[in-house]
């Protein structure tokens, strides 16, 4: 509620031809978009979600690999390939997708 009042005051202030004070803009921005810590983006959370899908948390490939002798994923020094499933990547990194992943969706 406090942010709405400040924004209305700021709008009236600018409409009258005054210069907008930068410290007030910064204060409104900080209160309107509060920074919450991590939101489940820690390395532990990424590894947990990747394990849940059966994927590597670094390169998003299937891990453990089906054919270990030809796999490029060692789960330690691997990097994502040219094309990878962006839905899998988004779920592992951010934890939220448009559709909650289910083992039957053939990721």
UniProtKB/Swiss-Prot annotation:
The keyword Zinc applies. This is RNA silencing suppressor. InterPro entries: Carla-bd. It comes from the Viruses. GO terms for biological process: regulation of DNA-templated transcription; symbiont-mediated suppression of host innate immune response. A zinc finger (C4-type) spans 56-78. It comes from Chrysanthemum virus B. Suppressor of viral-induced RNA silencing. The potential mechanism of action is based on sequestering siRNAs. Keywords: DNA-binding, Host-virus interaction, Inhibition of host innate immune response by virus, Metal-binding, Suppressor of RNA silencing, Viral immunoevasion, Zinc, Zinc-finger. Pfam families: Carla_C4. GO terms for molecular function: DNA binding; zinc ion binding. The keyword Iron-sulfur does not apply. Residues 46-49 are annotated as: Basic. Belongs to the carlaviruses nucleic acid-binding protein family.
């Amino acid at each position: 509620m406090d942010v709405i009042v400040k924004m209305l005051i700021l709008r009236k202030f600018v409409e009258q031809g005054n210069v907008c004070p930068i410290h007030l803009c910064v204060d409104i921005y900080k209160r309107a978009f509060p920074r919450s810590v991590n939101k489940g983006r820690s390395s532990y959370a990424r590894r947990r979600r990747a394990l849940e899908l059966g994927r590597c948390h670094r390169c998003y490939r299937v891990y453990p690999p089906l054919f270990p002798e030809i796999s490029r994923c060692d789960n330690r020094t691997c990097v994502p390939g040219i094309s990878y499933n962006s839905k899998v990547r988004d779920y592992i990194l951010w934890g939220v997708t448009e559709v909650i992943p289910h083992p039957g969706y053939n990721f």
